Curated annotation (Swiss-Prot):
GO terms for molecular function: acetylcholine receptor inhibitor activity; ion channel regulator activity; toxin activity. Residues 1-21 form the signal peptide. Belongs to the three-finger toxin family. Long-chain subfamily. Type II alpha-neurotoxin sub-subfamily. The keyword Cytoplasm does not apply. Expressed by the venom gland. Binds with high affinity to muscular (alpha-1/CHRNA1) and neuronal (alpha-7/CHRNA7) nicotinic acetylcholine receptor (nAChR) and inhibits acetylcholine from binding to the receptor, thereby impairing neuromuscular and neuronal transmission. Disulfide bonds join C24-C42, C35-C63, C48-C52, C67-C79, C80-C85. InterPro entries: Snake_3FTx, Snake_toxin-like_sf, Snake_toxin_con_site, Toxin_cobra-type. This is Long neurotoxin 3FTx-Oxy1. The keyword Disulfide bond applies.
């Protein structure tokens, strides 16, 4: 009986995702990946560099523990808290 209970406990632990982590799109590959433990916020950061006029804004996608704050003017950061919510921006 103890063996059966132990087996059920092990199967339950293996089947349940006890350490759920957020999934976000990550650059440069723009693919969905699990975020490291403790990072439950997805973000999209956009900014202009020297090629902004011809190529458009640069984009950085990733995970964070809290929503990052821009360190310079001209950097836009959008945060969200659902799986894969930080899709690559669609430009007009």
């Amino acid at each position: 009986m103890k063996t059966l209970l132990l087996t059920l406990v092990v199967v339950t632990i293996v089947c349940l995702d006890l350490g759920y982590t957020r999934r976000c799109f990550i650059t440069p590959d723009v693919r969905s990946e699990r975020c490291p433990p403790g990072q439950e916020v997805c973000y999209t950061k956009t900014w202009c560099d020297g090629f902004c006029g011809s190529r458009g804004k640069r984009v950085d996608l990733g995970c964070a523990a809290t929503c990052p704050t821009p360190k310079k003017k001209g950097i836009d950061i959008i945060c969200c808290s659902k799986d894969n919510c930080n899709t690559f921006p669609k430009w007009p």
